[in-house]
């Protein structure tokens, strides 16, 4: 049965960073489009390696997303690891580890696995201290994308049936993107290429991997004050509960 994957059970709480009542296993979400890059002195915020990466980014949105994810990860370190409270931001560095297919943050000799996601300006970050099987994904729900055509080309037949069953375009889109974020999250949790998880039935794959999944949708206002809907899914070990916080502000 697949109904529970569509019940929007993932906890997403809107809050300010200063009021964050942070427990472990938390995912921070933030609209990076609200960042003004000129408000930040990048050499103070980013390591020399990170500076080379952000300088390669061409679009302002890509720069905003990169800066936001790195700053959020570093503030998470300071909140969850009191011994690093006074460590300068530019002394922490994020680098992708090819062997594990994980983005890792290097902090005073410690190496911590992370997970990030971004879609159309909305970013999310989490720290995975115990290196457990965990992944999450964010995706903008777009009615303009040919999601039915994409599903029929890439998805499992059972998934296609779930997508085409609803009679409204919105419901079909919601189902398509929920399945998509579950596949992406599973790929991150298991360090498998997403290309290997497109055609298999994601619900069977989750069951075989003995992993849990929960999801929800959130609405964020864009620069024109239009509401944009995003789907968020988390895949994790059954013994661990994750929750999300949508931040309304940012630390400078």
Residue ranges and their predicted role:
Residues 1-252:
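Core catalytic alpha/beta fold that binds nucleotide/phospho-ligands
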